[in-house]
From Swiss-Prot:
Active site: residue positions: 65 (proton acceptor)
Site (Important for substrate specificity): 10, 66, 148
Top-level taxonomic group: Archaea
Protein known as: dTTP/UTP pyrophosphatase
Keywords of the record: Cytoplasm, Hydrolase, Nucleotide metabolism
Organism: Thermococcus onnurineus (strain NA1)
Subcellular localization: Cytoplasm
Cofactor(s) the protein requires to work: a divalent metal cation
């Protein structure tokens, strides 16, 4: 049994494009983490999520966590509209990194990794930022935007895996294929 340890509808949708038979069991892990380097931060949270769900239900478990970072700071999910505004203003006109750490526990062994994608935002006016915030879209997303939704308008270019920016890099699908899971 393949288990996705995530409540994210975006991760569920991407995995479902390539693998049909899996179960969703969200983890009960807090997303609080004292680590400050994006790769180690995302990997640690992915491992915690995968281990917690594996200990509850067994099977092959996928845990993932995505971190948006700029200037050495990790931007989590905004806690308020004002925080979303500050994040989007910080990203405006600049390049940032999106790092997704993943952990797959298969037959008791862990396979983990991290994927990094660079994203360049266009210059954003305050009017556009507030219009986007009023849609509600940024409030449950790291870095306060969703590239797959209205937030995609802000992106000038990306360097790397688009699906990583959404939160589920295709490297995970390839790892599952290597572990014997049927893809497509």
């Amino acid at each position: 049994m393949l288990v996705l340890a995530s409540a994210s509808p975006r991760r569920r949708e991407i995995l479902g494009r390539f693998i049909k038979d899996f179960k969703v069991v969200p983890s009960n892990v807090s997303e609080e983490c004292s680590l400050t380097e994006p790769r180690t931060y995302a990997l640690e949270l992915a491992r915690r999520k995968a281990r917690e769900v594996y200990n509850r239900v067994g099977g092959t478990v996928i845990g993932a966590d995505t971190a948006v970072s700029i200037d050495g700071h990790i931007l989590g999910k905004p806690g308020s509209e004002e925080e979303a505004y500050r994040m989007l203003k910080l990203l405006s006109g600049r390049v940032h990194r999106v790092t997704t750490g993943y952990c797959i526990i298969h037959e008791g062994e862990e396979v983990s990794g991290a994927v990094v994608t660079e994203v360049k935002f266009r210059e954003l006016s305050d009017e556009l930022i507030w219009a986007y915030i009023r849609t509600g879209e940024p409030m449950d997303k790291a870095g306060a935007y969703g590239i797959q939704g209205k937030g995609g308008l802000f992106v000038e270019w990306i360097n790397g895996d688009y699906y990583n920016v959404v939160g589920f890099p295709l490297e995970i699908v390839w790892k599952l294929r290597e572990l014997g899971f049927g893809v497509m």
